[in-house]
Every structure is written in C-alpha cells, then in structure tokens.
Amino acid sequence: MKQVNGQKLLESLGNGVSAIRGRITPDAPMDRVTWFRAGGLAELMFQPHDTDDLTTFLKLVPEEVPVLVVGVGSNLLVRDGGIPGVVIRLSAKGFGDLELAGEHRIKAGAICPDKNLAAMALDHGIGGFYFYYGIPGSIGGALRMNAGANAGETSARVLEVHAVDRKGDRHVLSKSEMGYGYRHSGAAKDLIFTHAIFEGYAEDKAKIRNDMDAVRQHRETVQPIREKTGGSTFKNPEGHSAWKLIDEAGCRGMMIGNAQMSPLHCNFMINTGQATGYELEYLGETVRQRVMDHSGVKLEWEIKRVGNFMPGYEIKEFLGRATA
C-alpha cells in the first residue's frame, strides 16, 4: 500500500499555490478532525478561505489526484493507513454563513451546524426545521445524505444547492437535480457543496420551541451524545429499525478493542478510549454479519468509511474478519 507523502504532493502543485489564501497542511492527522477521534493522516489537507479560493485550488490539483471533502467529521470513519490525495475541510469563516434569503427562506453555508439552522428558523418563526436540532454535523453533510430525523428530512426543505466540481467550476442544483432518496443524494460525487437555500413556512415560535425541546430531550435520553461517536452507524432497512436488529442479534454493548456498540443506543458505535479505525470498522462488520446470521437482513453503513487500511489489517466487507 502506498503511504501518504503530503510534502511531495504539495510540491507537485507548483508555484500556483502562492495565490492560495487558505491553509495547506501536509500529512494532517485526521484523528483531530473526526468525532470518532481515530484514523491516519490526510496526505494533504486544504482549508479554503472562501469559494473563490476553493475554485483556484482545485484547478491546480491534477485530475488523477483524489479529492475528498469533509465537514465537521461527524459521520466519518477514517482508516488507519490514511487518506491519499487531498482532503478539503471547509472553514466556518468562509462557509459558515447563515442569513435570511427571502420570506421563510434561509441561506446556510455548508459548514454551518445543523442545529444552528434550526435555531435561526426558531428566531424568525419559520417552521419545518425543528428536526435539524437533533442531527449532529453540518449542512454540507445533510445535503449529501438527505439527513433527517423525527419525521423531517432535508429534501423537504431545500430549494437550491450551490456547489463546485472537481475542476473548480461552479454549479447551482435544484431539488430535483439533487436526486434525493432515503439517506441518499444522486448528485455527482465530485461536487463540493458550498451553501444552500432552504424554505419553510410561518409557524408559531412556541410550537417550534416545543418541537425542538422534544427533539433535544429525546436525544439526551436515548443517544450517547457525550461519547466519541459518528452518529447512527447503519441505515434503517426498509420495514426495520437497525437498532432493534442489532439488539436482537445480541450486539448491544459488544466491544472489539476500544470500539463498542453503545449500551444506550446500539446503533451508535463509540470510541471508549483510543480505538483505532480498524477496531471500529471491524466491530461494524462483525455486527453486520451477526445481524445477517440472526435475521437475514443486510445492514448498510450510514457512516462513511474512507482511506487505506494498514498493511496486515485489511477487513473484508460483511465478513467481519481480517484477511491478513
């Protein structure tokens, strides 16, 4: 397996990087970025100053170099061998804007926390956004995966999405062009979302506040929100609840190394100490196999897994055991 070498990649970009205003970091530790606090190095991390800076940088990066965008790292599992190519981490200064965009409309930057969108909607009496108060992560991730909770989801509120493609060209996508499905967007995978326009409706602030309080109380009661976790580990299969399938297969509280399926909510995987990316993914694949053996249902990952395995620590998908 090729090891990451950020300095070499940075030098290959040439003199054009002198025009970049954002931060470029070779061999950046991803365990400082993700909520799991695990994983290897990013070969090169770029934090753009704004959208113009992002487009300028992307035009410098050769087409064969992979590019991965991360938000706040809430739904991301990085493997221990690191991430080859460029990791783009959007900054709050350039991509965290949150402002009114017309009657019952809000413009939100991709790195804006989901709960902040809910809070602004409350401040202005705009209904339809309460569910974001219970979703960890940022708007960019919500746009990509059609995030939802408590009977609400992103596709019901989004009007248009602004993005930059791998070549640095800008695009504006309508809701239909986003191709939304359950926890899925059909938008091109190379698109980097920069901001979006959302639309709600007039609603009494007291009603919105009550709905948000109910979401908060539910999360605090049934989810391990103070642990190092990436949120829901697996999608709910049609007609089933993932947590119930995991529980019935005897996997509540299961541990591999320092990785554990939370005893509080067994569809939440947590890092109880210094878990490696290998331990976390190995645990997840073991749970998938046990659920299949018990119920015949195949769980699909909701958490995004990226990067390379360390040599000798490869994991076969859906077998839950190392191939080494």
Curated annotation (Swiss-Prot):
Keyword Cytoplasm: yes
Domain FAD-binding PCMH-type: 36-211
Keywords, sorted A to Z: Cell cycle, Cell division, Cell shape, Cell wall biogenesis/degradation, Cytoplasm, FAD, Flavoprotein, NADP, Oxidoreductase, Peptidoglycan synthesis
Cofactor(s) named in the record: FAD
Protein family per UniProt: Belongs to the MurB family.
Described purpose of this protein according to its UniProt entry: Cell wall formation.
Matches recorded under NCBIfam families: murB, PRK13905.1
Protein name, entry field: UDP-N-acetylenolpyruvoylglucosamine reductase
Gene (UniProt): murB
